[in-house]
């Protein structure tokens, strides 16, 4: 997509050269400067976090989900990168601790989707939501407001569409 940086939009995350546990500990130290608390969400944000081998992903996710301070595993990905095996893995992880999957939709308008090089059509998104929900996994949808050439009406149509989907959250980005 044209809106991701070379860091996969995870420019403020801990170094990917660190282990998952080391990244969690670094994140805890960073957040302790502003917030108090002892419960955290392990958020796999940068890049497409279901685009790797099943074994590799399972190792990463298990390291995060078994950390004693992690309460939720949140995974950002593309709807077209959810194979049956990945969905089964997420379902199994969801039995250990809650799993949220953040799907990058950005917009329902195909012209805008082509402009940002989203790479898949709306039915792929709808199928991903359906498959995740069948497995009891909560879905958060990432949208981008005010894409070039989109009107206020276009934005409202995207939000109205999402209001009729079986999703549990919307991430709005300007």
Where are these regions (language model features)?
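Conserved C-terminal portion of the radical SAM core fold
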Residues: 123-174
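Generic structural signal for well-ordered alpha-helices
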Residues: 21-29, 57-62, 87-91, 125-129, ...
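Loop-centered beta-sheet repeat module
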Residues: 107, 118-122, 141
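Conserved residues at the C-terminal ends of beta-strands
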Residues: 7, 76, 173
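Alpha-helix N-cap and loop-to-helix initiation/capping positions
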Residues: 19, 52, 56, 116-124, ...
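Canonical Radical SAM [4Fe-4S] cluster-binding loop centered on the CxxxCxxC motif
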Residues: 1-19
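Conserved SAM/AdoMet-binding glycine-rich loop
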Residues: 34-117, 127, 134
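Auxiliary alpha/beta "docking" domains used to position bulky ligands
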Residues: 17-30, 45-46, 50-51
